[in-house]
C-alpha cells in the first residue's frame, strides 16, 4: 500500500505518492482547485487513491514559525477532516514549515526555469512533505 502526500493551496493541490515500500516520495501532479467554491479536487483524488492503492493520506500543516496555527493551518485541518469523511482513510497532518521553500531551492539548484518551477512547485512541495513523513517512520 502507498501513502499520498498533499500540499493544499488556495488555487492548487500538490499531490505526491510513495513507492510501495514507503521509502520514497514522488511528485505526481498538481490539481486545480477552488477553495472558495468548495472544490477540493476530491473526484481526482478518488481516482488517484484507487489507482495507487493508497491507504494513508498526509496533509501538509503549515504552522507558523513559532508553532502557532494561522488561517492556512486551520484550512488544512478542515481539509483533512473532509478527506477523512470522504475517503474513510487515516489522514495525518504533517508540519510543512519551509517545504515550499525547500522545493523551490531544489528546483533552482537543478536549474529549472522560473516558468517551469511555477508549474511543478506544488507537487514538489507535496513530495517534500511526504518524504519527511516517510523518513520519520523509519
Swiss-Prot record:
Keywords: Cytoplasm, Hydrolase, Nuclease, Ribosome biogenesis. It is found in: Cytoplasm. Pfam families: RuvX. InterPro entries: RNaseH-like_sf (IPR012337), YqgF (IPR005227), YqgF/RNaseH-like_dom (IPR006641), YqgF/RNaseH-like_dom_sf (IPR037027). Transmembrane segments: none annotated. It comes from the Bacteria. GO terms for molecular function: nuclease activity. One of its GO terms (biological process) is rRNA 5'-end processing. GO terms for cellular component: cytosol. Its EC number is 3.1.-.-. Gene3D superfamilies: YqgF/RNase H-like domain (3.30.420.140). PANTHER family: POLYNUCLEOTIDYL TRANSFERASE, RIBONUCLEASE H-LIKE SUPERFAMILY PROTEIN. Could be a nuclease involved in processing of the 5'-end of pre-16S rRNA. Belongs to the YqgF nuclease family. This is Putative pre-16S rRNA nuclease. It comes from Geobacillus kaustophilus (strain HTA426). The lineage of its organism: Bacteria, Bacillati, Bacillota, Bacilli, Bacillales.
